[in-house]
Amino acid sequence: MFITNILLKKAKSKNILVLMESAVSGHQFTMIRERLADKLELQRFDPYIQKMCLYRERKRLRSLN
């Protein structure tokens, strides 16, 4: 590996955009979290069933600056 590749390499961003999905209805939304944090699980209002339900992180979408 050349030394120029190491010097010109960009640093990884601190935050990433992730896709959250409802465990009940499949409703999805995006959320920002830190790269080093654990996968997200949270309770939030689901507009499809009109109740609070569990949302889990499904996948990473992209990194943010």
UniProtKB/Swiss-Prot annotation:
One of the GO BP terms on file: translation
Main location class: mitochondrion
Gene, per the UniProt record: mRpL33
Location relative to the cell: Mitochondrion
Cellular component GO terms held in the UniProt record: mitochondrial large ribosomal subunit; mitochondrion
Molecular function GO terms recorded: structural constituent of ribosome
Classification of source organism: Eukaryota, Metazoa, Ecdysozoa, Arthropoda, Hexapoda
Keyword Cytoplasm listed: no
InterPro entries with a match to the protein in the record: Mitoribosomal_protein_bL33, Ribosomal_bL33, Ribosomal_bL33_sf, Ribosomal_zn-bd
Keyword vocabulary terms for this entry: Mitochondrion, Ribonucleoprotein, Ribosomal protein, Transit peptide
Family: Belongs to the bacterial ribosomal protein bL33 family.
SUPFAM superfamilies to which the protein is assigned, alphabetical: Zn-binding ribosomal proteins
UniProt keyword Disulfide bond present: no
Summary of subunit composition and partner proteins: Component of the mitochondrial ribosome large subunit (39S) which comprises a 16S rRNA and about 50 distinct proteins.
Natural source organism: Anopheles gambiae (African malaria mosquito)
The protein, known as: Large ribosomal subunit protein bL33m
